[in-house]
Amino acid sequence: MRLTRRAFVQAAAAPLLAPPQQAPPAQAALTVAHLVDRIRAAVGPWREKTVDGIKAGDPSVALTGVAVTVAARLENLRRAASAGCNLVITQEPVFYGANDDPGNRASDAVYLAKKAYIDQAKLVLWRFSDHWSTRQPDPRVAAIAEALSWQDGPGSDNIYRIPETSLSSLMAHVSTRLGLRGGMRTVGPPGMRVRTVLVSPGTTDLATTVARLKGADVVLAGEPREWEVVPYVLDARESGAAKALISIGRIVSEEPGMHACAAWIRTLAPGLRVEALPVSDPFWNAAS
């Protein structure tokens, strides 16, 4: 069939005369508050009384990236900003006190310098401690065990079975794998044989020790209450029980768990920059 000149012109002009296609609506930017809501939904019921929450900054801002750390020290805040992360998620307090209330620090030069940097860098600080540490199974315990290459365990009591070793060899293994510089203290004889270890990151109180030490040779503790836990372990030994305590420091004991937290957050926001910022052992001694 022969195409007339008129038909040809009409066919050529048709795309120009058609109504314009509407562009798809732009996707709203993910804000800090959006991600916090996702995390809260993923961990389940939110406690009425908790230390967790926004400690500084505006959560309504667009999220550029997340830095996860066990301690939001000024050094790590600078690293977060340099990495393009405007949300810092921390296990420990931002402003030193348990509830981040400045109290008598409100006019302190150190507090003011930190607050000024947060404001200047437009960072948002969110504490995520209570709800992360009470997940079951405890992700902090699992992360320490993974760092130490312990596979056998735990039960609900956080006790791991390990290849038999001496207490001094266990100390060396823990020190090397967790990067301790000087924060380890031990109760018990170096040659004591060890087969089972109770892993207790963070604060180790007397109730936990009494309830669980029966099934373990050693407590691997973060920050034991020295006036409670140490006398109990010493008296257990004096009573004939072969028990020991290794204290590695709170920060060292919590850090592997926050690296695991960063990996978990990546699953909630695929494609989002999520950095795990190490803190490492803040202590040193003459032998390190």
How would you describe each model-predicted region?
Residues 2-288:
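Hydrophobic structural segments
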